[in-house]
Amino acid sequence: MASYGMGDLKKGLKIEIDGIPFKIVEYQHVKPGKGPAFVRIKIKSFIDGKVLEKTFHAGDKCESPNLEEKQMQYLYDDGENCQFMDTQTYEQVAISDEDVGEAKKWMLDGTMVDVLFHNGKAIGVEVPQVMELKIIETAPNFKGDTQGSNKKPATLETGAVVQIPFHVLEGEIIRVDTVRGEYIERANK
């Protein structure tokens, strides 16, 4: 396993603390007026989803987790679990809706995702950062609604709701940032 020092930490990095795998969701390098610099991070547990705040000083180390990522296809949700299939071996894995978490609102049947395994147990899902999804419901446009900074809510085919510019219409396919939950642009289709 690789070992990470204070200088190696960054947003998105997966680390292990006390045997629990985490993902760094926020990173801040602090240089106080007195004393040595340090790094303050917010980490989210892959096991229970809790977010913790940790401080790392020069010389502090943490390990890389024993995580395996496998690309799998989302099949369906049976009400309690989401079902995924390895497209190479056709092996199916059930992951609880709770462990899938926020990723669920971006997945359509057939979506390829990265399933995370910790010590052989499926613990989470990561969807692609940018996805193309169809708008199924939004407010109609009115005369004078042009490209501007005004936004309106739109429901996507997965059920997720994002804010879109007024000039984007129902039925259009848009690109969405799944990490921030934001509209990026219209898809070129």
From Swiss-Prot:
Designated gene of the protein: efp
Family: Belongs to the elongation factor P family.
Keyword vocabulary terms for this entry: Cytoplasm, Elongation factor, Protein biosynthesis
GO cellular component, one term: cytoplasm
Pathway: Protein biosynthesis; polypeptide chain elongation
Magnesium is among the record's keywords: no
Cited SUPFAM superfamilies: Nucleic acid-binding proteins, Translation proteins SH3-like domain
Protein name per its UniProtKB record: Elongation factor P
Keyword Cytoplasm belongs to the record: yes
